[in-house]
A protein has these predicted regions:
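N-terminal mature-domain "stem" immediately C-terminal to a signal peptide or N-terminal signal-anchor/transmembrane
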Residues: 1-6
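Charged/polar, solvent-exposed surface patches and flexible loops
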Residues: 10, 20, 51-55, 199, ...
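Short secondary-structure junctions and interdomain/linker hinges
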Residues: 15-18, 60, 207, 211, ...
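Leucine-rich, highly hydrophobic segment in Treponema pallidum outer-membrane-associated proteins
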Residues: 20, 85-87, 94-234
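Generic recognition of flexible, low-complexity loop/linker segments
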Residues: 26-27, 168-172, 208-212, 255-257, ...
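General "foldedness" signal
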Residues: 53-57, 63, 153, 196-200, ...
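Long, K/E/R/D-enriched contiguous segments that form extended
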Residues: 217-266
Length: 266
């Protein structure tokens, strides 16, 4: 409609017309249990933000209906999205399942707005370590959220002591003049998993760039890794299930010799 077009033009000129602060963190999160996705924003101008919600609701074919419950304002965007906010922050919560009741979504969003530190992600030791190293974009993932069937599949190829569900995966992206720096890693609070991860990482060494002369100058992607095949084979054989499968395959192919022959850049 004309109102949304007018707001869109204003936002193009000045993004703060949404009433949202772009100087503070913008946070996306996913709840694996409730199957919901959240967006957390800092409010800079509550009146402008309410105007934005009004236009957003009208575009979705709904009347603006902002209700106040104690110190929290609640607005239903559509059947699968809700916004709760106060004079400081706004939380958009989206249901990934279409059969989710809006009352349940409202209940979850209100609980998140009211929860204390002890019930939040800040109480997770694994996240605390991650939050100490912030860049422009920061991504944190708990492997415990991976479906159990997928975890079992991955586990069948990894050392027995490596508990995937205890691993946290991280990515940091930093935008600098003339370049983008991406750092990724993983860590665990579980002692046995830590040791297994260190052992697994020892399989990989620094690349020597031995074969770069053979790569054409117009290449758009180069991926290289330095592997110790003998170490890799020994680690894989620590998993009894994998060792049994290797035994069956080895009747046709000498995998120990094949994998063990890898020693250097690929």
């Amino acid at each position: 409609g004309p109102e949304s077009k007018e707001l869109f033009e204003k936002v193009l000129q000045n993004p703060t017309e949404l009433g949202i602060s772009l100087k503070n963190d913008i946070i996306f999160f996913s709840d694996a249990i409730e199957n919901e996705i959240g967006l957390l924003l800092k409010i800079d101008d509550q009146q402008k933000f309410e105007t934005f919600l009004s236009i957003l609701s009208s575009e979705k074919g709904k009347d603006t209906n902002i209700k106040r419950e104690n110190d929290i304002f609640i607005s239903e965007i559509n059947a699968n999205a809700i916004c709760t906010f106060d004079d400081n922050k706004a939380l958009f919560l989206f249901a990934l399942q279409y059969n989710t009741e809006i009352t349940e979504l409202k209940k979850d969003a209100t609980a998140l707005m009211n929860q204390n530190k002890e019930k939040s992600l800040l109480s997770n030791n694994g996240f605390s370590k991650f939050s100490q190293s912030n860049k422009d974009v920061n991504i944190w993932m708990s492997m415990a959220a991976i479906p159990s069937t997928t975890l079992k599949l991955y586990s069948s190829f990894l050392p027995t002591d490596l508990k995937i569900s205890s691993i946290y995966s991280t990515t940091h992206i930093d935008f600098q003049r003339g370049k983008i720096i991406i750092e990724s890693g993983s860590y665990s609070d579980d002692t046995k998993t830590k040791k297994a991860l260190d052992n697994l990482i020892s399989v990989v060494g620094k690349t020597s760039n031995s074969f770069l002369k053979q790569i054409p100058e117009n290449s758009w992607l180069v991926w290289s890794v330095n592997l110790n095949g003998e170490k890799l084979y020994n680690i894989l054989m620590e998993n009894s299930k994998f060792a049994a499968e290797i035994g069956n395959v080895s009747k046709e192919i000498n995998l120990q010799q094949l994998i063990g022959s890898i020693d250097g850049d690929l």
